[in-house]
UniProtKB/Swiss-Prot annotation:
Belongs to the UPF0242 family. Pfam families: PAS_12, UPF0242. It comes from the Bacteria. This is UPF0242 protein CPn_0755/CP_1117/CPj0755/CpB0783. It comes from Chlamydia pneumoniae.
Length: 401
């Protein structure tokens, strides 16, 4: 057993020589089984590996010898220091110095690591500082550009302010000039208005005189009609002719008044005192004309529009004498007109300026009654292209009613 242990100890002690020996012996073992080229290549490879193995083994053995020498030296020193108190103290002081040196090395390594870390932070900080400097330069350049723009805008604003002040002065001068012109025009308008008011008063007086004259004419016509009623029946044809002439004459006067109502209103100050539209002026003139026509008692007076084929005005005598409204007389095929209806409709739509004729009309209270009619075309005024007409009864009892 002791021999086995000794042999194992020797094997473990010199195991490093096993690889080089195996490397040298392997070609000899395999030599019979290799070809010539393999033998040459194998010797080269095995020789190289064996050389490396021997170098490794020698290096390993050298390290073992150094370690053994150091251990032997330490053992000798320990034995010497154990016997000598001074050497033992020196040895302990050396150990302490070695421990302090190790601690100092550890601290030095930590400081080096901290230094490396700080150097990294410093490099990083320098990089960030350079970036900040670059950004600062960029911002400075932008601020300089913005300052230049602000200066140019301030200068432009000053120029615009001067222009606005100049325009305000010119506008104030223009407004003052316009105000002066307006005052002058207002004074002129006041003078013209006073003049027109005077003319309107004068025209009103003339209209009153005209109405008085018309009233006298109607009285004279009434007297003539009373005289005509006393004429014997054998002179009825002559009387009918006189009635036609009188109707035509009176209707011409009314037509003249209707055509010239626009000229009369233009002489008054109403068109200058008001700012009405043309449609309002037209309706106002028509209303004034219809009011004046309602005051006429010549007969059943009406105004007929050819385009719309309807009556735009009719006085109250239609309803009083016949019991029907004016629209019933103006319809095609009306059963109210018993005789003369065809000629009546032709005359209403005729292009002649004046027409006259005779109708027999069915009334509600007196049966069939004869009427004389007279039609006249209006060529100007607010009722231009309309027809002014009148129906006059030939029986006395109708007039008396």
């Amino acid at each position: 057993m002791l021999l086995v242990r000794k042999w194992l100890h020797t094997c473990f002690k010199y195991w490093i020589y096993f690889l080089p020996v195996v490397t040298l012996l392997l070609p000899l073992v395999c030599y019979p089984f290799l070809s010539i080229s393999q033998k040459i290549y194998g010797y080269f490879v095995f020789t190289t590996i064996s050389s490396l193995g021997w170098f490794f083994a020698l290096r390993r053995r050298e390290n073992q010898l150094k370690t053994a020498a150091v251990q032997l030296l330490q053992t000798k020193i320990r034995k010497l220091t154990e016997n000598n108190e001074g050497l033992r103290q020196i040895r302990e002081s050396l150990k302490e110095h070695q421990q302090e040196s190790a601690q100092l090395q550890i601290q030095s390594q930590k400081l080096k690591n901290s230094l490396f870390h700080l150097q990294g932070l410093l490099v990083k900080t320098k990089g960030e500082g350079q970036k900040l400097e670059t950004l600062l330069l960029h911002r400075t350049e932008e601020n300089r550009c913005l300052k230049m723009q602000v200066d140019s805008l301030i200068q432009e604003c000053g120029e615009k302010t001067e222009e606005v002040q100049t325009l305000n002065r010119e506008l104030a001068e223009t407004l003052a000039y316009q105000q002066a012109l307006n005052d002058e025009y207002q004074a002129t308008f006041s003078e013209q208005r006073n003049m027109l008011d005077k003319r309107q008063i004068y025209i009103g007086k003339l209209e009153n005189k005209v109405q008085d004259l018309m009233y006298e004419i109607r009285n004279l016509l009434q007297l003539e009609s009373d005289i005509a009623e006393n004429i014997p029946s054998q002179e009825s044809n002559a009387v009918t002719g006189n009635i036609s002439l009188q109707l035509s004459s009176e209707l011409k006067k009314i037509a003249f008044k209707a055509e010239n109502i626009e000229a009369a209103s233009s002489l008054t100050a109403s068109r200058y005192l008001h700012t009405d539209t043309s449609v309002h002026n037209y309706s106002l003139e028509c209303r004034q004309l219809f009011d004046s026509l309602r005051e006429e008692n010549l007969g059943m007076l009406f105004v007929y529009a050819r385009q719309s084929q309807r009556a735009v005005f009719a006085n109250a005598l239609f309803k009083t004498w016949t019991g029907y409204c004016a629209e019933d007389f103006l319809k095609f095929g009306s059963d109210i007109v018993i005789s003369g209806g065809k000629q009546w409709m032709e005359d209403l739509h005729s292009s002649r300026e004046e027409c006259s004729g005779r109708l027999v009309i069915k009334t509600k209270s007196r049966g069939h009654l004869p009427f004389r009619y007279c039609l006249m075309a209006l060529n100007k005024g607010p009722l231009c292209y309309h027809v002014l007409g009148v129906l006059y009864p030939l029986h006395k009892e109708v007039l008396q009613s």
